[in-house]
Each structure stands twice: as C-alpha cells, then as structure tokens.
Amino acid sequence: MGKLMAPKILVTNDDGVYSTGLKAAFDSVSDLGEVTISAPAVQQSGVGRSISIFEPLRITKTDVGGIPAYAVGGTPTDSVILGIFTILKQMPDLVLSGFNIGENISTDTITTSGTIGGALEAASYGIPAIAASMQVLDEGQKFDDPRDYHRERFEAGIKIVNKIARNVLRHGMPENVDLLNINIPYHAEEDTPIEITRLARKVFKTDVEERRDPRGRSYYWIAGDLIREEEEGTDVHAVMQKGYVSITPISLDSTARIEFSEIEKYL
C-alpha cells in the first residue's frame, strides 16, 4: 500500500510576509501537512480581492522566522494565484489567510479586507479556505509595524485554528460554505467560548477628516469609530460585546435570496 500524501496547505496574509501574524498562521497548521507561504512583500491591508493585471509581478525567496517563504510583489490575491499556479503548480488542500492584526468582522470587511480577499480567491477554485484575524484593543496597532506585534497574543488563536483546520482537512466544508471567517478576541484563551455567527451590517461609522498641507491645500483621511453594539448572533456582537471567538461561514454566491419577480417589477 502506498504512503499517504501529506495535505498541501498554502498560507498567505495581507499584513505582509514578515508579519508576526503570518508566522502564527504557519504555526497553526505546521503539523497538519506540507505548508507553503506565499504572501505580499509589503503591507496590503484594505486591498480586498484586488488583482494586479496592469503590471508584472515578482516573487522573492525569503524566510519568516527561519521558515522558507515566498514574498510576492502584489496583493494577497496575487499571492494566492502565484502560490497555486507558479509555486505549488497544483491546487492545495487548504488555504489559510492570516492571522490579520485587527478583527475582520461585518460586511464592511468582507469586500475590503485583503486577508479575506486572499481566502475568497482560493475558495473560487473550490479550495477550502480559512481567514483568521486577531482583535486589537488599540486601533492604532493596525498601523504599526506588523513585525513587532506581540507574538504571545496569537497563542490561543493558533490552537483554535489548528483544530478547525484539522477538521476541514478531514471532512471538507459544509455544503454551500466556501470560507470560514474566524475572529479571535484580544483576551482569548484556549477555552474561550466559540459562537457561530452571521455578518453584522457595519462595524465602522465612516468619517472623513480634512486637513491642510503646508501650501494650504486640502487632503483627506478616511477614518471613523468602531461600532461595538450590534444584534445578538452577529460577529460584531460576539467579538465586541461577549469577547467570544466568532466563526462566520461565508459563501461566494452573493445573489440576493428573493423571488426574481420582485426585480421584474422594475423592468
């Protein structure tokens, strides 16, 4: 009888290849199979599922805490595409995107998060995908150097993601689920309760700050405060109010669940 092949796992992120969160993601699945890292060379937060089609991409071999890795001069989606079609040259059994430094909750982040964007790209090929994010208490930490973020903050998340990834590899995804979006609260322990949630509508109260440069010309920062109170059963409520781990099953199919006759009225 032939020897069973170890599962192939691709790891990516949006904070850049040298983020401590990426090393934590590697550690969370390192005992589950043959792990390859393909991640953006630099910070790519907020790029969503964007893809580079007007410029060439380069891949640089590097290492993450002594682990061989590939740094891609592009987005998380680029990193997944090159990881699959150029580096691995085959479909992996699982793609893990994370750990993001900062929570990715609500519909706000599904279309803007590079962490989730990379996972969605993998899911579009039928690959089981997990996006994992770690809550920060100080929103300013999202803009600090991700190489300096405290390694110990990921310990509980590593164990939680390991268990979930192990079961995804063993059983596959449930029907109509393409991606599991996991958010770990800042003070999580291994026994922190886990809640299966739906997406909240919003997590940001969007604002725009106008400032003036030395020549008196206006420039702008997109900003806003976090929404911490949302309906029971949402990811925002679970993470922000209860301090629970949130797991939200996501489908690529964004078609509204309505009778099409409702739209025909507009024709």
UniProtKB/Swiss-Prot annotation:
Instruction: Give an example GO molecular function.
Output: metal ion binding
**Reaction catalysis annotation:** a ribonucleoside 5'-phosphate + H2O = a ribonucleoside + phosphate
Keyword Oxidoreductase assigned: no
**In terms of one coarse class, where is the protein primarily found?**
cytoplasm
Q: What is its EC number?
A: 3.1.3.5
Write down the SUPFAM superfamilies for this protein, in alphabetical order: SurE-like
Q: Which cofactor does it need?
A: a divalent metal cation
The UniProt entry's coiled-coil ranges are none
> Record-annotated residues binding a divalent metal cation?
14-15, 45, 100
The domain of life for this entry's organism is Archaea
Which EC class does it fall in?
hydrolase
Q: Which cysteines are joined by disulfide bonds?
A: none
A GO CC term?
cytoplasm
Note describing how the cofactor binds: Binds 1 divalent metal cation per subunit.
Keywords attached to this Swiss-Prot or TrEMBL record, sorted alphabetically, are: Cytoplasm, Hydrolase, Metal-binding, Nucleotide-binding
Where is this protein localized, as stated in its record?
A: Cytoplasm
What is the stated purpose of this protein?
Nucleotidase that shows phosphatase activity on nucleoside 5'-monophosphates.
Return the similarity comment: Belongs to the SurE nucleotidase family.
The name under which this protein is listed is 5'-nucleotidase SurE
> What organism does the UniProt record list as the source?
Methanosarcina acetivorans (strain ATCC 35395 / DSM 2834 / JCM 12185 / C2A)
